[in-house]
Amino acid sequence: MKRILFAFLVAFSIFSLPTFAGGKGSHWPAGYVRVDGPNLVQANGEKLLIRGTNFGNWLNPEGYMFGFKKVNSPRFINEMLCQLVGPDEAAAFWAEYKDKYITREDVKFIASCGANTVRLPFHYALFTDEDFMGLTANQDGFARIDQVVEWCREFHLYLILDMHDCPGGQTGDNIDDSYGYPWLLTSEASQQQFCNIWQRIAKRYKNEPVILGYELMNEPIAHYFEADMALLKGNLEPLMKRATAAIRQVDKKHVVLLGGAVWNSHFDCFSDWTFDSNIMYTCHRYGGEPTPDAIRSYIDFRDKTNLPM
């Protein structure tokens, strides 16, 4: 499933371009986005309808976004670079890549187009001492997010943090940098690491209202694991509840976003939507007409849960 999510939930409106006071002295936003029934509500009481885009391929390199035909996941891309130019030059490339792929000017442009939110996919290894993007210790995940937070504050954009590549892999494809199976859903060690990293992230950003919320994982469980689908789906909601509980130990303010199984499209794996008062669901739609009927199952699930989708 090799696609780019350029917009999620709502398309850009280019006819309503905002102006920004911005600046480091800005006190925007006044408070946290929260869930209120099927809506997201800002601190001023106004509903928030997400308009935005996705910073894919920055902190989670993906081969198809580079235009590679055979090298697809982060570790394979790094292996290719090391074979071509050696580990030192590969590390130098990644350092410059992270500095230049997304910049303040990009965030400024996105805001000028009428967006109100950006989604930041990231690899869990950015919060470990694993070999990733040229570093084997002192990973810079927090430093990178801190910078995006300040850019978003300056240009009045909310930020969704999306763990696109989870320990063990949640999808079983190239997009999660896994070993070809969603081991996260069967490995206790991976699940504990997953929860620990989210708790560390939540502890750091618990008082940061620029962050709209924490998207626990991207597109869990690829469709082709049919033989294990019941097992994998059955393990998904308990893990999401466990991770949410870990977050709530340190952060009770931010929204937690839960994606459905099978590329964020199947929501029959969820049976309890009352375990937390500030959760929402997130769906991905590939193809189809831009009509309510094309996303009827998502609308029905939203109405059933009375939570934002």
Give the label of every model feature segment.
Residues F20-A115:
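N-terminal carbohydrate-binding accessory modules
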Residues M1-I4:
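Positively charged n-region of N-terminal signal peptides that target proteins for export
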Residues W28, V33-R34, E89-P121, L126-T128, ...:
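An active-site-proximal structural segment forming one wall of the substrate-binding cleft
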Residues A7-S16:
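Bacterial N-terminal signal peptides
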Residues L49-L59, N116-F122, L126, L159-L161, ...:
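Structural recognition of the beta-strand scaffold that forms the well-ordered cores
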Residues Y32, T186, Q192-G213, M217-M309:
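Extracellular glycoside hydrolase catalytic/binding regions
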Residues P61, T128-E130, Y224, H266:
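Gram-negative outer-membrane beta-barrel proteins
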Residues G63-G67, Q170-I175, F225-M229, D268-S271:
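Short aromatic-enriched loop/helix-cap "lid" or pocket-rim segments at secondary-structure transitions
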